[in-house]
Every structure is written in C-alpha cells, then in structure tokens.
Regions:
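Domain-level signal for Mg2+-assisted phosphodiester chemistry and nucleotide/NA-binding surfaces
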Residues: 1-87, 107-113, 117-119, 124-125
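Glycine-rich phosphate-binding loop signature in dinucleotide/nucleotide-binding domains
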Residues: 88-93
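Non-catalytic, usually N-terminal nucleic-acid engagement modules in DNA/RNA processing proteins
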Residues: 97
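Active-site-proximal cofactor/substrate-binding loop regions of enzyme domains
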Residues: 101
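Catalytic nucleophile loop
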Residues: 104
C-alpha cells in the first residue's frame, strides 16, 4: 500500500490549540503530513499564543482577515486553498480538515469525488 501524502488544513476559528500534537499523531497513522496550513486572522490578539506552537509543529500560517464581523472568511480561505491543492498538486493524495464547523461537507464530497482520502477531525457534535 502506497503512503498517502496528506495536507492538514486547520480552521483556527473552530479548533483548540492544545489538541494539535495529538491531531498530527493521528494523521501520521494514515500517511505523511507534507502540508500543514493553519487558517486564521493572525492580527487578532486571540491568536497571539498560537504562533510559537504552530511554528514548532511546522504549520504555515495563512492570513484570513476579517473585514466584517461574523463572516466566515477563514472557512472560505481554507476551501479555496484545498481546491487549489486538489487541482495543482497531484502528489497530495489525502486531506485532513481540522475544524468543529460542519460547513465543509461540500468540500469533502468534492475531494472524495476526485479520489482523495479525506479525514475530518473536530468535536463529536460536528
């Protein structure tokens, strides 16, 4: 069986920082996490404590600025990036969407239609 090359796409608006090491270990059971991107508004002081732990875990920080309150710019940025990876990086054979937001179902279906392995990690109620 061929090792999967997995892209971890992290929705920081709906994830807890302390679980990230466990999430990465879980992903490693299924393949090699070669892309680790964390999406969020990094100018927001709420995420200031995330920079060092994410850097230590080799995540690339993707800025998703919020221009209007209560809009899902982080979700949209994550979906656009996933689609870009899907169509431009054929060596990516799997995706791990880390979020406790159920809005990603259409993305998951599109990835599966394109024969990609997909993991979803989030809270049980998601």
């Amino acid at each position: 069986m061929e090792t999967k090359n997995i892209a971890i796409l992290l929705d920081t608006d709906n994830t807890q920082l302390e679980y990230l090491p466990y999430i990465i270990e879980e992903v490693k059971q299924y393949g090699n996490p070669i892309i680790k991107w964390a999406f969020g508004n990094w100018t927001n002081s709420q995420f200031s404590s995330w920079n060092v732990p994410l850097s230590n875990l080799t995540f690339r920080l993707i800025q998703s600025p919020t221009h209007v309150k209560a809009k899902n710019t982080t979700d949209i940025s994550l979906v656009i990036s996933a689609m870009d990876l899907l169509y431009t990086q054929p060596h990516i054979t799997g995706f791990c969407i880390v979020s406790s937001d159920s809005d990603f179902m259409q993305l998951v279906m599109k990835l599966i239609e394109n024969n990609k392995f997909v993991m979803g990690i989030g809270r049980k109620q998601t």
